[in-house]
Amino acid sequence: ALAAIPEPDDGDLFFDFEGDPLYTEGQGRWWGLDYLFGWVDADGKFDALWAHSFAEERTALERFIAFVLARRAQHPAMHIYHYAPYETSHLAAMAARYGVCEAEVDGLLRDGVFVDLYPIVRRALRVGSRSYSIKMLEPLYMGEDSRTDMAVTKGDQSIEVYLSWRTAVAEGREHDAAEILQGIADYNEYDCVSTLKL
């Protein structure tokens, strides 16, 4: 199973989305917004794109794909690691939704640039838990750097916290809104670093 993991490359990225599945606009033509595209590089440097509307999500998708293509031109052997199929299925769905970057996303998928670590872990490890959630595996490799002191610790909680950000913005509580977004960013960064360390 471990032979499925490509050789490391300086261009490798470790990627994670945060999303709100209940977000919609107007008449509800579309549902679900991936509001945070987050990644770390092989050195653990975090970067992110935010999207708080469908228009911003489209822009974030275009910017992310442009970034990946430029990085791949510099690092042809790079891969983008993620855990479970959410990231790749949502990138493809976004590209189809907006009619942008479809060929580019398809090419990255066909070329095997994205590497889902979940099936590799399922085949390679036997753990004392029914769940192979990355959060259940983290005690094996994250050491003392745990999620317990973070404002956001679980995916479903991040959705609730994101909704509280929208409320804070609507009520004009800018300081609270900034703190809430930082908590979500910290959670996403931890997920990306966890994927890197895994």
Label the model's feature ranges.
Residues 1-26, 70:
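Long, highly charged low-complexity segments
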Residues 2-5, 56, 184:
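Helix-loop elements that line ligand-binding/catalytic pockets
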Residues 7-10, 31-35, 73-78, 143, ...:
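Short, well-ordered loop/turn elements at secondary-structure boundaries
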Residues 15-18, 40-42, 81-84, 187, ...:
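Generic beta-strand/beta-sheet core signal
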Residues 22-25, 91, 197:
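Short helix/loop capping segments that flank catalytic or ligand/cofactor-binding pockets
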Residues 30-44:
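Short conserved beta-strand segments at catalytic cores or DNA/RNA-binding microdomains
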Residues 41, 47-163:
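Conserved DEDDh/DEDDy metal-dependent 3′-5′ exonuclease domain
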Residues 154-157, 163-198:
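Mixed-charge, glycine-rich, non-catalytic linkers/tails in nucleic-acid processing enzymes
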